[in-house]
Amino acid sequence: LYGCRGIYLPLQTDAWGISTPEACGWAVWIGAAPWIARHLWDHWRYSGDREYLKEAYPFFAGVAEFYEDYLVRDQTGTYQILPSQSPENFIPGLGEFPVLLGKSSAMDVQLCYDALGYAIGAAEALEVDADRAALWKTLREHLPPFVIGSDGRLLEWDRELPEGEPGHRHLSHLYGLYPSD
């Protein structure tokens, strides 16, 4: 999907096994695979089971491979996530329709950062794929930084924008604090 290699998991599936994005916005969220990778990584981290890590490594590598193709390098050398979405939130658009997709939402960047880190850590622990791990490190080092707003808070999007729903119940942009490390 999206013309990318690697592993992408949709947000949803239905009773018929259809898992393609059916709506703009929440259905095109790309964060499910890195979120699942977090659970696999936690299992490895707390168990230390190398056999488990060998089985989980293809998943970590597959998620990282998806980002190899999905990230877009901009004129400054930063790898942007385009399109990007912040779950169930929006940016007030021009006219009557909200904008559901943007560039490098905080949550997408944080999930990508973690997923690349899991792939790097697993490759190093298993002493495999040094070249791929080097690429993943480069991508990770050139992701966009967190953006702090004029009022001192971590912003949900790549720049200060009007909020579609101030006080929205999802604090997706805080993923980097929890459950991430």
Predicted segments, located by residue:
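Active-site core of glycosidic bond-cleaving carbohydrate-active enzymes
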Residues: 1, 18, 24-46, 50, ...
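Carboxylate/His-rich catalytic cores and anion/metal-binding grooves
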Residues: 1-8
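A residue-level signal for beta-strand positions that form part of recognition/binding surfaces
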Residues: 6, 78, 176
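Acidic/His metal-coordination segments adjacent to aromatic residues that form catalytic metal sites
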Residues: 9-28, 84-104, 160
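Short, small-residue-rich loop/turn micro-motifs
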Residues: 13, 34, 38-40, 83-85
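Acidic/histidine-rich catalytic neighborhood
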Residues: 62-122
